[in-house]
Regions:
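Residue-level recognition of oxygen-bearing side chains
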Residues: 102, 228, 241
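C-terminal helix/juxtamembrane-tail motif
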Residues: 242-244, 250-274
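GST-like fold's C-terminal all-alpha helical module
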Residues: 107, 121, 125-238
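GST-like domain detector, emphasizing the conserved glutathione-binding G-site
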Residues: 2-162, 170, 272-274
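Extracytoplasmic ligand-binding clamshell segments of periplasmic binding protein
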Residues: 187-189, 245-248
Length: 274
């Protein structure tokens, strides 16, 4: 048997909290996981079903340096050698799950959103949509963060945003066709939510905001061209299980993505507060 991680209590947090989720203080990849946790709390037995540890994306004692030099090192030694953000601590099961897709899959099964049989059709559909939506997320990363051959200034961001929105229509069309092919409201089950739906919602929701940043004549309503996607987006927004999430600061106040730290350049950093 391989060596097992040493599990140490952290201020007795697991005695009252079922899940602790850690991520940067933004929506990004954290938003779908936060949504899942809000969804799951309806059947929670714990007094405090979840807690968030939001890491500030600043190079100071409470931000990036603390995560990489202290918290991540501790996690590697005590609970998961793959330590990364986002992470999820399941205090009841004494597990630390890392990486976005793995965390969504874990919570999807914990909350009964996804079927447990690996070869089930729901699991197959869920996995395919999860990867398709992640491709769209990767395209967003190239738009909002400073990478070679990507945006470096506010002017470049303003120029590339319309091009990005036009390009994302290809993904929207594939997702629209998928919903039409199966005649589903949601992506992996006809009338019931699966874990892939949370990231799909977040990416559509982010793009709804990006459209508001366009100049006058360039403003558009991309989602109106895809009625099934629009219905899906509205159906998720109206779910009573997510009401507390949509009222939370994590949804209303957090930036969609972080400002980059590269070369002290803040970048456009689209924010839900703009």
């Amino acid at each position: 048997m391989p060596p097992q991680p040493k599990w140490k209590k952290e201020e007795e947090e697991e005695d009252s909290t079922r899940f602790t989720m850690g991520y940067w203080q933004m929506r990004g990849l954290g938003a779908p996981i936060r949504m899942l946790l809000h969804w799951g709390k309806q059947n929670a037995e714990k007094t405090k079903p979840f807690a968030f540890k939001d890491v500030q994306y600043t190079q100071d004692g409470d931000g990036v340096n603390k995560w990489f030099k202290e918290d991540k090192v501790k996690m590697i030694e005590e609970s998961n050698p793959l330590a990364n953000i986002p992470y999820l601590i399941d205090h009841e099961e004494k597990k630390t799950i890392v990486h976005f897709l793995a965390t969504c899959d874990y919570l999807g099964q914990k909350f009964g959103l996804d079927e447990k049989e690996v070869d089930s059709e729901q699991r197959e559909r869920n996995a395919q949509i999860a990867m398709e939506v992640y491709d769209l997320r990767n395209n967003v990363i190239r738009l909002v963060y400073k990478f070679p051959n990507s945006v470096r200034t506010q002017e470049e961001f303003d120029k590339q945003l319309p091009e990005h929105l036009n390009a994302c229509k290809k993904t929207y069309q594939k997702l629209e066709s998928w919903l039409g092919f199966y005649d589903f409201t949601y992506f992996a089950k006809k009338d019931e939510v699966s874990s892939c739906d949370f990231h799909a919602f977040e990416m559509i929701d982010q793009h709804e905001h990006y459209q508001t940043l366009l100049a006058g004549d360039e403003k558009r309503d991309v989602l109106s061209e895809f009625p099934r996607l629009k219905k899906f987006h509205q159906a998720m927004r109206n779910r009573p299980e997510l009401k507390t999430y949509f009222e939370s600061k994590e949804y209303t106040d957090f930036q969609l993505n972080n400002h980059t730290l590269a070369n002290s350049w803040d970048g456009p950093g689209p924010s839900s507060m703009k």
